[in-house]
Amino acid sequence: MGGIRLDTKQLKQDIIDYAYTIGIDSIGFTTADPFDELKQKLEAYHANGYASGFEESDIALRTEPKLSLPTARSIIAIAVGYPNKLKGAPKSVRGDRRGLFARASWGQDYHTIMRKRLDMLAAFIESKVPDVEIKSMVDTGVLSDRAVAERAGLGFVGRNGFVINPKLGTWTYLGEMLVSIPFEPDDPLLDSCGDCTICVDRCPTSALVGNGQLNSQKCISFLTQTKGYMPDQYRYKIGNRLYGCDTCQQVCPKNRGINTEQDDIILEPEILKPRLVPLLRMSNKEFKQTYGHLAGAWRGKKPIQRNAILALAHFNEVDAIPELKKVATTDERPLIRATAYWAIGQILGEEARDFINANYDQEDAEVQNEMIKGLDTRRE
């Protein structure tokens, strides 16, 4: 770097000090060496069919940092705490049932929040070392945010698969940057969950398979983001969740008493815990205007509306029947019509048979299947 000897120890401290002034709550440093242990875990993860399909499928890219930045010498990991308490949250009552977005999607999309901080941190480093090479990543990058954070000393990976930070708990957004500067690495945090298995025991779908591993195919957070039919065995498991699931974090003892607020995370109770029936009426434009700033909107309105219909069935919400009938008979999307017919059958039982029979012949096979299923597999 220009042939000038760089005081990396002082620069590291300067970076740490600056990070805390721009809304970064925890920062750590590690090498750019391969994540060999992670490679073995990912190979088993894919072999067992646990992958969600949302993450980078190339294991080499996920575990070898220098494939992303050949000049990388270090990785700087950052964590930003996010709030988990919603002040003034409206109540969900009969006739006015509400859904819920997971806490990681509260406020402005966290990708935007994290990129802003990483860009500011990168600019600071570049002001000190103009010829430095940097590559930043947040969530959708190829590296494993959790593996990087753990090795950089931000926390340890708990049985729920989340990095548990001593001050922030699991309620954190994670990001990292590869840099061409050889910083002294921090030591990993020596801590563990001990004998605690509360998260494993309380997971609604038994998706936690031990040692911090997750079967994404059973995880409610993943299931709420899929665009197809919700598997039968999970339809009532999702409850009123519209996007994501926080159960394994809510029950974690390490999270007790923790609630981190950020100036740029503005909580809107009516949006984060919305009325279910009005949600079904939203056009694409209205959905984008209302929810487009949330991370939970990244898959579009169809999964959210499907989940809203399932939530109405979960609540056995008879007052929603007129709207569900309208959706079932007028919506252009087979998935949404089918889910609405299923929910009507679940809520009304035999009382729905005449309505379903009257519309049966005009539907295609996949919708007809859900119409029958709604009547014949009603939850008692």
UniProtKB/Swiss-Prot annotation:
Its cofactor is cob(II)alamin; [4Fe-4S] cluster. Keywords: 4Fe-4S, Cytoplasm, Iron, Iron-sulfur, Metal-binding, Oxidoreductase, Queuosine biosynthesis, Repeat, tRNA processing. Pfam families: Fer4_16, HEAT_2, QueG_DUF1730. GO terms for biological process: queuosine biosynthetic process; tRNA modification. It is an enzyme of class 1 (oxidoreductase). InterPro entries: 4Fe4S_Fe-S-bd (IPR017896), 4Fe4S_Fe_S_CS (IPR017900), ARM-like (IPR011989), ARM-type_fold (IPR016024), QueG (IPR004453), QueG_DUF1730 (IPR013542). It catalyses: epoxyqueuosine(34) in tRNA + AH2 = queuosine(34) in tRNA + A + H2O. Residues 181-213, 234-263 form the 4Fe-4S ferredoxin-type domain. Its EC number is 1.17.99.6. Binds 2 [4Fe-4S] clusters per monomer. The active site is at residue 139. [4Fe-4S] cluster 2 binds at residues 203, 219, 245, 248. GO terms for molecular function: 4 iron, 4 sulfur cluster binding; epoxyqueuosine reductase activity; metal ion binding. The keyword tRNA processing applies. Pathway: tRNA modification; tRNA-queuosine biosynthesis. One of its GO terms (cellular component) is cytoplasm. It is found in: Cytoplasm. [4Fe-4S] cluster 1 binds at residues 193, 196, 199, 252. HAMAP family: QueG (MF_00916). Catalyzes the conversion of epoxyqueuosine (oQ) to queuosine (Q), which is a hypermodified base found in the wobble positions of tRNA(Asp), tRNA(Asn), tRNA(His) and tRNA(Tyr). Belongs to the QueG family. Monomer. This is Epoxyqueuosine reductase. It comes from Staphylococcus aureus (strain NCTC 8325 / PS 47). The lineage of its organism: Bacteria, Bacillati, Bacillota, Bacilli, Bacillales.
